[in-house]
């Protein structure tokens, strides 16, 4: 995690409103789901600042010295492009042989690609990434370990839900 060691880039925000008393409960209600449920659509959820698999959000795991350390985890299953291309080529060749064709139409190529993804995506390990944060509730300050506008927008959207 960037806040633990080494250099890092962060964005700092003032929290304009008073934070609710049950803040940790609100984060726990939106915790990251189990990795078995991850598909090819990105899934967002909160984890503690310890690691991307720690979904037990409580005072012992997320609070230190009055500050909250949490990470917004994104999980998605992706099929490597080289593997997907190889599987598609294999299926296209089998289709041409079975139907005695010289080529495969673009419509059929699209269908073969979709079927290949559907068939193999759950065999792929989920790719995990995280955007760490430190929240100082008494100072009403939020430090987010991200610098790109898209990451910050994604983070703030989830933070204010």
Residue ranges and their predicted role:
Residues 1-41:
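Short Lys/Arg-enriched alpha/beta "domain-start" segment
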Residues 5, 62-63, 134-137:
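Short, flexible turn/loop "capping" segments at secondary-structure junctions
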Residues 11, 132-135:
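Short beta-strand scaffold segments in enzyme catalytic cores
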Residues 11-13, 68-71, 140-146:
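Short cationic amphipathic helices and targeting signals
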Residues 20-21, 77-79, 150-152:
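Primarily extracytoplasmic ectodomains and periplasmic/lumenal surface modules that are beta-strand-rich
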Residues 25-58, 62-132:
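Surface-exposed, low-hydrophobicity interaction/linker segments
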Residues 135-161:
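Loop-centered beta-sheet repeat module
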């Amino acid at each position: 995690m960037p806040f633990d060691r080494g250099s890092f880039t962060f964005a700092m925000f003032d929290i304009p409103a008073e934070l609710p008393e049950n803040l940790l409960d609100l984060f726990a209600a939106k915790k990251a789901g189990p990795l078995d449920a991850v598909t090819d659509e990105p899934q967002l959820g909160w984890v503690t600042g310890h690691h991307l698999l720690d979904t037990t959000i409580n005072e012992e795991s997320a609070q230190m010295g009055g500050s909250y350390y949490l990470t917004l985890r994104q999980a998605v299953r992706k099929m490597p492009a080289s593997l997907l291309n190889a599987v598609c080529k294999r299926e296209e060749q089998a289709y041409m042989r079975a139907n005695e064709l010289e080529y495969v139409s673009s419509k059929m190529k699209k269908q073969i690609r979709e079927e290949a993804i559907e068939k193999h995506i759950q065999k792929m390990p989920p790719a995990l990434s995280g955007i760490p944060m430190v929240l100082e509730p008494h100072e009403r300050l939020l430090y987010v370990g991200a610098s790109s506008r898209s990451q910050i927008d994604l983070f703030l959207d989830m933070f204010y839900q």
